[in-house]
Amino acid sequence: MMDWKEAEELACKFLKKKGYKILERNYRTKYGEIDIVARDGREIVFVEVKSGSGKVDPLERIDLKKVRNLEQTARFYMIQNKLKGPARVDFVRVTPEGIDHFEGIWLG
């Protein structure tokens, strides 16, 4: 079974291959943590990485509270770094079968 560090490393490599620029990893605030902050063209992308194997889909561990915390942390990052313009939250699922990228997940 892969640990979270391995999963994040694989996710970073995957995103770089897609042309993303990794800006920061494991960004923390009082609101929560964002695994990867990246740039996709003009857009800032906040990426939550989930890994796992077995019968439970890693994405099932993401609930509304987690999404709200991601949104707050993303907004804080934008303000703290004086960034304007488009931004989004993505999820990357890393399993032994491969990597799936879900773009533009905003639930609020």
Curated annotation (Swiss-Prot):
Single GO molecular function: nucleic acid binding
HAMAP family in the cross-refs: UPF0102
Protein family per UniProt: Belongs to the UPF0102 family.
Source organism: Thermotoga maritima (strain ATCC 43589 / DSM 3109 / JCM 10099 / NBRC 100826 / MSB8)
Name this polypeptide is given: UPF0102 protein TM_0253
One Pfam family here: UPF0102
InterPro entries according to UniProt: Restrct_endonuc-II-like, tRNA_endonuc-like_dom_sf, UPF0102_YraN-like
Entry superkingdom: Bacteria
